[in-house]
Design a protein with these regions (language model features):
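Short, flexible, solvent-exposed loop/turn segments with mixed acidic/basic and small polar residues
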Residues: 14-19, 50-56, 182
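Conserved alpha/beta core surface patches that mediate binding of polyanionic ligands
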Residues: 2-11, 33, 134, 144-156, ...
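Small-residue-enriched alpha-helical segments and adjacent helix-cap loops
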Residues: 25-159, 165-167
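N-terminal basic/disordered segments at the start of proteins
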Residues: 1-41
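Catalytic residues for metal-mediated phosphoryl-transfer on nucleic acids/nucleotides
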Residues: 208, 221-223
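Cys/His-enriched microdomains
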Residues: 94-97, 134, 161-174, 190-203
Length: 223
């Protein structure tokens, strides 16, 4: 019987379990998004080749445990039919995580999924001295905890007051959580040292009196 190359299997997402010749398969999931087709195939494989359940990881991943050694090649073929691929383990670029971003969330400032797909396309699985993680979050609510990733990307809005559209209603001042906005003598004053570029002022304004451009806040090193 040929010797099993456990290192190569782990590199390709198949992690050894404590049960002999059983593996938990980590799948490649980009930005936490799975289609109905993906989900159906994952359920089918988990039922046929696993023990009928999956594990949702802390980084938006999916793992199918109790895959038998002799079924590994067949499992990969079956998953491919549903648009699913094995993930990676070890010292390489891991799953790119993302919140739902501005395509769904009212607070989102950037298209997080589009960015996650691009990062995944460029870097996923790349060999490095240590495991490496990207995280993309859409706004200052920071649902994805961007700073905990080796590279964190947080959506922001660069805002500029447009005096000719302003009706001095004060909504922007009330919306600002960092007290960066003050209205003085009919003018909106922005203290950019206090501004966290959340964009709440622009989104709350009833007359579109803010020029708002998407931007990115980057963090490096993780926690």
């Amino acid at each position: 019987m040929a010797e099993v190359d456990y290192a190569t299997l782990k590199k390709g997402g198949f992690m050894r379990q404590k049960q002999k010749d059983n593996f938990s398969l980590r799948l490649q999931v980009v930005g936490g998004a799975l289609t109905v087709e993906n989900l159906k195939k994952i359920a089918e494989v988990a039922e046929k080749y696993g023990d009928g359940h999956v594990h949702l990881t802390s980084r938006q991943g999916v793992e199918i445990p109790f895959i038998k050694l002799q079924d590994i090649d067949e499992v990969k073929e079956e998953l491919a039919k549903g648009g699913c691929k094995p993930g990676v383990c070890g010292p390489r670029v891991r799953t790119v995580t993302a919140c739902q971003g501005n395509q769904i969330c009212p607070s989102g400032n950037i298209d997080t999924y589009e960015l996650a797909v691009e990062l995944d396309k460029r870097y996923f699985g790349r060999e490095l001295p240590h495991k490496f993680k990207f995280g993309v979050t859409g706004c200052q609510n920071n649902c994805l905890k961007a700073e905990e990733n080796d590279v964190g990307i947080k959506g922001a809005l660069n805002v500029k007051w447009l005096e000719d559209k302003c009706i001095n209603c004060g909504v922007c001042e009330k919306a600002c959580r960092t007290e960066a906005i003050k209205i003085e003598d009919g003018k909106v004053i922005v203290d950019y040292d206090k501004c966290n570029y959340c964009g709440r002022c622009a989104k709350a304004c009833p007359t579109d009196a803010w020029d708002a451009k998407a931007a990115y806040i980057l963090s490096f090193g993780g926690t």
